[in-house]
Amino acid sequence: MSYNNPNNSNSHLRPHAYNNSRRDDSDGDESSIEFLNQRSNTPLTQGTYNYHNTSTNSLNFQQPEPIYRNQTRTSLSDSYYDHPIFDTSQTQIQPPHDNPFTESYEMTDTSYQGNDHHYRTGQPNHLMNPTYNQAFIPHVYDEEDNDEQEYDQRIQYNQFQGDHFDLAAISYADDESQSQLDYVPTERVIPEGEEEEEEGETSFEKEPGSETISGPFGEERSFEEPPPQQEVRSKKLTRATGLNGHLVLDCPVADELLSKFPDYNPAEKSGGLSREFAFMRYTAVTCGPSNFYRDAYILRPVHYPIPRQTELMIVITMYNEDDILLGRTLKGVFKNIKYLESKARSSTWGKDSWKKIVVCIVSDGRTKINERAQALLAGLGVYQEGLAKSRVDDKKVQAHMFEYTTRVGISKVTDDVVKLTTEKVVPVQMLFCLKETNAKKINSHRWCFQAIGQVLDPKIVVLLDCGTQPSGRSLYELWKEFDRDHRVAGACGEITTSLKKRQMITNPLVYGQNFEYKISNILDKPTESSFGFISVLPGAFSAYRFIALQNDINGIGPLEKYFKGEFLHSSGELDPNDDEFQMKHLMLKEEAGIFTSNMYLAEDRILCFELVAKRGCNWLLRYCKSARAETDVPEGLAEFILQRRRWLNGSFFAAIYSLVHFYKVWTSSHSFGRKIFLHIEFFYQLINLIVSWFSIGSYFLVFRILTTSLGDKALGFAPGKILSVIFLWLYLASIVTTFVLSFGNKPKGTEKFYVTIVIFFAILMAYMIFAAIFMAVHSIQDIYRSGTRITVSLFFQNSEFRDLVVATSSTYALYFLASFLYFEPWHMFTSFVQYILLSPSYVNVLNIYAFCNIDDISWGTKGEVGGKSLGEAKLREDGTFDVSVPISKEQINQSYLDQLEKIRDPAPPEEKVLVTNTEDYYAFIRSMTVLVWMFTNFVVIALVLETGGFNQFVEATDLANLKSNRAAVFLTVILWTVAFMALFRFIGCIYYLITRLGREIKASEHATK
């Protein structure tokens, strides 16, 4: 088999290159339909794509022509891609083999014949498997969304064609005979005392009894379970040819999965499916993301005879989220891809749109990934157990990449289980990048932008967090923002919170965050979008134009600034053997410091500023309200505090960064008017920064003024004075407690204290609202009693009433008005009260904890060295690899069923075991000691100097005498106490002197005797 690289003369066979000029994606363009039909009917056999040569039986892994070379340019930034995708001087063509493994990772094994029948029922084997039946169900439409049915009517599901490119990854050893293979297939162990049966006989007897299971569509089937079969897996090394000197394997997908596809034909090879659907590729990456492109790693979309142009790369970052959160995100993404496939009148989308989209899932750490989430990916076909290796030729593997074009969709996601389907599914090109170690989310983005993105060269990159579910048309709406205006470098949509009705009362924290998100999407984001600069595009749901992110020829630019945060927050010392050692060392040497490190906790804010202020460019940022995504928010207070610590510190220092470097805007290509508007926005951000800085002091003053005013005798509220003193002491106690807990204590270890403080501030806020209303009503009553003519101006002559009305209307009234103008008022009725009661905690608790932990520049995760070894692939002298992988159909099918078993049933409830960490316990004792010490001293001071509000109970004429008398008493007590202690010590020393003198006299008398 050989693969001949197309030369430049065949460039007309490639998909048309990206063009940054505006394209009208309007419906009704018949010429665009004709264009799509012509392009989709282009035969794949044109040109010189002779990738199968039976005469030579050789492997030729020359690289396909990079798409970047013939890319249409419309800006100077495109020169970034002038260099070829691969350096051919470093690429070595693999030597030919005498006996190539022509079936590409398939052995001629008669032990399993794919879609065979069950030994009793005569049914296909996969239909009789209970695990398989419970994992797959028919396609189910969402009750709240009927658009998907309309999409299905415009899609021809029986006409999907994948690519047939063949990468021969496994071969027999050329120095051994057919009977001495490098790999021995799985064999069944015959128990001692039994004879081996002849071929064709069954190795077990029928047993009475049967088990009833549900079929794939809900029907009941009865079959008898065979006894367990003992297997021994005597795997030896198998020869792998690799690609460009890297371990790359094309692995067959389990027949248990392929047999579910509507066009599967068991009589044909690979079920009659194209290799793109029948094989999954694994690549062991032994370099860092910055060297992925340089080291000539290649991905499937650009490795086909006609390389595919990626219009949209969807990046999903994952840490330890379970299968439910991952399933929600993938369900939303798959639905969006189906919508793009259904757009028959679009010049860009429509038939075969799935070939322009790559879904990239990056998991942060092999030992951190959730087992059920990994099993879900295996159910989709994009992951197989047993392929990954920890080392390749003594080099550590830094990432495991699995590529597959899946035709498995997600039918339904409940609160506890994910159901798969193969009905009405549009193919999806998926890439699963499993990082070997946990290196934080920003490192995951670096793998996408610096490694995967450099090879695929997508036009638009969409960032999603695992658990964020985009609505049915959100990705198209985001893409349209870039297509309409070539100046748009980044865009974000509206993020909504996942709400449960019962949490409205049981967990007001969730609904309070919902109100915060809604107001931000109604007031903040649209305002910033009007200026062309959004201070932060949330990493949970945003999109960027890939070419706008690129650095200049000197390596300076948005991505360079964006990725500095990874090196500043890295834990531990740098590894000298790391291929990125010099780059990381240089970053740390130039940028280390608390200010810079905290600034890069909000690296997405730095990226936004660098895009708008990019030298010689006029990029803009937009907010797309029609694009929506739902996400989960922290439900626990400890998790919420930790999240906001990073947000507040990062946004505070990032705001300072943008204000200090505002002059960079003048080096951009923005018009003079745009630069003036940007400066107006910067001035607004400066005011907002000042208000945030003094927010805790301002809130205390408002509290003190309202409570003391309510205690005035003229208002006639008798408990006012007493309550003002009680709330003052509790307020100060809460503030001091928060300060003490914030220094060195983890919120999870002292969560009960934080809950108590938040509840107190909620009660305090309710009292302050009552005080404001009571005083306003009293002012109106005074006006009526005075008999003065009622006018509008009269209400504003009363200073207290005027200030209250202005402050209230400028916030809460505007919230109502803006919400109704956007036709989204419901959060004002369901979440407004919760947010108001939580607002004091936002000001006091969150700000105090954030500023007390400025020195904590971590993301809440620590680097680790990885889990147990997965084995090693050895490089031979001829450039091939010796590797041990499962290759028999029995193993592959059993592995697939084992993965489905993990997600078949809901996950068992987690047992909440209260384990007190020793460090948390000692920190708790320390904090309590400090608090008792501080409060007892404060009580003495307050009683003596009348500073704790006690002066409110004393008449002004007697206040001076009372203070003087208490001070005199205090001094008298202190002086006499000091005198007594001195006298006591004097008596003690005299007694010691007398007794010592007595002992010496006795000793001398005894000596004379």
Curated annotation (Swiss-Prot):
The EC number(s) this enzyme carries: 2.4.1.16
Biased composition (Polar residues): 1-12, 34-62
Its membrane topology: Multi-pass membrane protein
Lineage top rank: taxon: Eukaryota
Top-rank EC class of the record's enzyme: transferase
Reactions mediated catalytically: [(1->4)-N-acetyl-beta-D-glucosaminyl](n) + UDP-N-acetyl-alpha-D-glucosamine = [(1->4)-N-acetyl-beta-D-glucosaminyl](n+1) + UDP + H(+)
Residues spanning the membrane: 647-667, 682-702, 722-742, 757-777, 804-823, 930-950, 967-987
Protein name: Chitin synthase 2
